[in-house]
Curated annotation (Swiss-Prot):
It is an enzyme of class 5 (isomerase). Its EC number is 5.2.1.8. It comes from Streptococcus pyogenes serotype M49 (strain NZ131). GO terms for molecular function: peptidyl-prolyl cis-trans isomerase activity; protein folding chaperone; ribosome binding. This is Trigger factor. The gene is tig.
Length: 427
């Protein structure tokens, strides 16, 4: 293989590389075997056409595209490695020449990782809007949340108030015509929860079981169903039940209901304080780490960050989000219909975060390189064991899923983060 690289602009260039016949011939054989079973020729059973007959009838050139797809990935990666390039986006491949019996020549337009000029990243002084302190109010608030979770809904003989739950039937109409999704039976609605469009819940305050209430509202201009956006609607609503929350007393019995390992309310407060202090400590450390990394990135200069890196990071985030939606049974088409958004609308919110994430990774990688951080065999094994424990899977399975290079990279990145944060101080 012969390779060359022509620089076209900052972080951009063209690789030219060749693929030898000793690589091409096996690829042509695989391409032929792939289609052989479907071939017919006089005097031969289907799927048994000899290669010379095929070449004479169709020409070997018809196999070139499939053969190229077979041999290209390995050839391209070999060229990138030989040239010592750090490519960061999908290349644009073009065929320069593909002649029978000769080596093939291809070109690849590539984007390379930008230069990072590091600034100060050690002994940084940062400000954080966080505290390690846990107050009595924090402990009481946690207990109160648990107390509210144990509340029971009981039938209320009287008017519905904010915070009460009403069980309703409703039928919605616009200009006297009922509309899709405007009907519900035995729906439990907590007044003040904001589940329904603005104004709906407020008009049920004061209603009693057995009442029929005409609720008049206007759909927001931004409502996802365009045929309803901005329109006035009427909902004929029947109140079946009014329920109110009955919250348990704040006493030792409540404490035991919340946590069976404690005997008194005071025991629960002590336990919750320890838990909150541990969580607050972690939150504080995370805030310091985030602020220190952010300052290290701000102190660095990234020379002509390629927009392709941002686009690829956005695509990764969008694909991850849509994958989560599909696992919940929501297809991309359904999601866009339900939300009234487009593919472009989905990409936009991720752009700023993607830009920040790409810059952060580049700077941390540059610090790891500047410090000469590498992963030892024992560190790699420890990382594998830690991941196996975290994801509850055998270590061998983790080892098979992650390449050694990926693990080495992650460990070096962690060391770089450690050198930033361990030397940082809080103003």
């Amino acid at each position: 293989m012969s390779t060359s690289f022509e620089n076209k602009a900052t972080n951009r260039g063209v690789i030219t590389f060749t693929i030898s016949q000793d690589k091409i011939k096996p690829a042509l054989d695989k391409a032929f075997n792939k289609i052989k079973k479907d071939l017919n020729a006089p005097g031969f059973r289907k799927g048994h056409m000899p290669r010379p007959v095929f070449n004479q009838k169709f020409g070997e050139e018809v196999l070139y595209e499939d053969a190229l797809n077979i041999v290209l990935p390995e050839a391209y990666e070999a060229a990138v490695t030989e040239l010592g390039l750090d490519v960061v986006a999908q290349p644009k491949i073009d065929v320069v020449s593909m002649e029978k019996g000769k080596e093939w020549t291809l070109s690849a337009e590539v984007v390379t990782k930008p230069e990072v000029k590091l600034g100060d990243y050690k002994n940084l002084v940062v400000e954080v809007d966080a505290s390690k302190e846990v107050s009595d109010e924090d402990v009481d608030a946690k207990i109160e949340r648990e107390r509210q979770n144990l509340a029971e809904l009981i039938i209320k003989d009287g008017e519905a108030a904010q915070g009460d739950t009403v069980v309703i039937d409703f039928v919605g109409s616009v200009d006297g015509v009922e509309f899709d999704a405007g009907k519900g039976d035995n729906f439990s609605l907590e007044l003040g929860s904001g589940q329904f469009i603005p104004g709906f819940e407020d008009q049920l305050v004061g209603a009693k079981a057995g009442d029929e209430v005409e609720v008049n509202v206007t759909f927001p201009e931004s409502y996802q169903a365009e045929d309803l956006a901005g329109k006035a609607a009427k909902f004929m609503t029947t109140i079946h039940e009014v329920k109110t929350k009955e919250v348990p007393e704040l006493d030792d019995e409540l404490a035991k209901d919340i946590d069976e390992d404690v005997d008194t309310l005071e025991d629960l407060k002590v336990k919750y304080r320890k838990e909150l202090e541990a969580a607050q400590e972690t939150s504080y450390d995370d805030a310091v780490e985030g602020a220190a990394i952010e300052l290290a990135v701000a102190n660095a200069e990234i020379v002509d960050l390629p927009e392709e890196m941002i686009h690829e990071e956005v695509n990764r985030s969008v694909n991850e989000f849509m994958g989560n939606m599909q696992r919940q049974g929501i297809s991309p088409e359904m999601y866009f219909q339900l939300t009234g958004t487009t593919q472009e609308d989905l990409h936009n919110p991720y752009s700023a975060e993607a830009d920040k994430r790409v810059k952060t990774n580049l700077v941390i990688e540059a610090i790891a390189k500047a410090e000469g951080f590498e992963a030892t065999d024992s560190e790699i094994e420890q990382e594998i064991n830690d991941l196996a424990t975290e994801y509850n899977m055998p270590a061998d399975q983790v080892r098979s899923l992650l390449s050694a290079d990926m693990l080495k990279h992650d460990i070096a990145m962690k060391k770089a983060v450690e050198v930033i944060t361990s030397t940082a101080s809080v103003k």
